[in-house]
C-alpha cells in the first residue's frame, strides 16, 4: 500500500493457513521440514505443480521414516529376546566403538546421558562387557532410526527393571513426568500425524488453486 502497510488478500490468508498445517508437526529428520518450506515457497509463487510434487515426495519420505522406525523396533525386540553372545568379551572404548560401528564421541555422549553405566578395569579404563555391547547395539539401532535419547532411556530403564515391555509403546509414549517432550520422544506417532496432515495439505493446495483462478480471471 502507499502508506507502507502490507496488504493481505484472500490468497495470502489461505497460504498462511496452509503453512500452519504444514508446520503443525515438527518432524526434522530426512529434510522433511525443509520440504515443507519449499512447498510453501512454491505456493507463494503459484507453482502448484511443484507444490503437489513436493507433497508426494514428502509422503514417500514419511513412509520410509515410519518403515525404518518400525524395523528398528523389530530388530530390538529380537535382540532383547536373544541371548548375549561372546560372554567373556571385554573391550576398551575405542575397541567398543569400532565393534559397534560408531565414534568414541557417540559412546561418550550416550554415557553422559545415562544410557550406559560401565565398570572400570584395575588400571582405570572403562570396560565394555558383552551385556554393554548388546545395550550399545540397541542404542545404535534406535538412534539410527532417529529415536530420541529420552525415548531410548525409557526403554532401557524398562529392560533394566525386567518389566514386561512393549517396545513400540514405550518408545512412543513419554512419561507424564518428563518436562520437555519432542517429536522424537514419540517418533512413530509424530510421523503418522504428519502423514495424516498431508490429506489436509492436499485440500489446501486445491483451495489455493481456486483462489488464484478467481484472482487472475
What are these regions (language model features)?
Residues 1, 103-124:
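Major-groove DNA-recognition helix of helix-turn-helix-type DNA-binding domains
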Residues 2-92, 130-217:
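Arg/Lys-rich, alpha-helical DNA-contact motif
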Residues 8, 97, 110:
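Append "Primarily bacterial transcriptional regulators
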Residues 86-107:
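Polyanion-binding surface elements
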Amino acid at each position: 500500500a502507499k502508506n507502507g502497510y502490507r496488504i493481505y488478500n484472500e490468497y495470502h490468508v489461505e497460504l498462511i493457513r496452509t503453512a500452519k498445517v504444514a508446520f503443525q508437526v515438527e518432524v526434522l529428520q530426512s529434510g522433511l521440514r525443509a520440504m515443507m518450506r519449499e512447498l510453501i515457497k512454491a505456493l507463494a509463487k503459484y507453482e502448484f505443480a511443484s507444490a503437489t510434487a513436493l507433497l508426494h515426495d514428502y509422503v514417500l519420505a514419511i513412509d520410509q521414516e515410519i518403515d525404518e522406525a518400525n524395523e528398528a523396533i523389530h530388530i530390538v525386540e529380537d535382540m532383547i529376546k536373544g541371548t548375549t553372545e561372546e560372554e567373556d568379551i571385554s573391550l576398551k572404548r575405542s575397541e567398543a566403538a569400532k565393534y559397534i560401528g560408531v565414534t568414541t564421541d557417540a559412546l561418550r555422549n550416550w554415557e553422559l546421558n545415562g544410557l550406559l553405566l560401565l565398570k572400570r578395569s584395575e588400571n582405570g579404563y572403562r570396560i565394555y562387557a558383552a551385556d554393554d555391547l548388546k545395550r550399545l547395539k540397541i542404542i545404535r539401532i534406535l538412534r539410527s532410526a532417529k529415536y530420541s535419547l529420552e525415548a531410548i532411556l525409557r526403554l532401557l530403564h524398562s529392560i533394566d527393571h525386567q518389566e514386561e515391555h512393549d517396545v513400540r509403546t514405550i518408545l512412543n509414549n513419554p512419561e507424564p513426568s518428563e518436562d520437555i517432550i519432542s517429536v522424537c520422544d514419540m517418533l512413530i506417532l509424530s510421523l503418522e500425524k504428519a502423514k495424516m496432515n498431508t490429506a489436509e495439505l492436499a485440500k489446501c493446495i486445491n483451495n489455493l488453486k481456486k483462489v488464484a483462478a478467481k484472482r487472475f480471471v
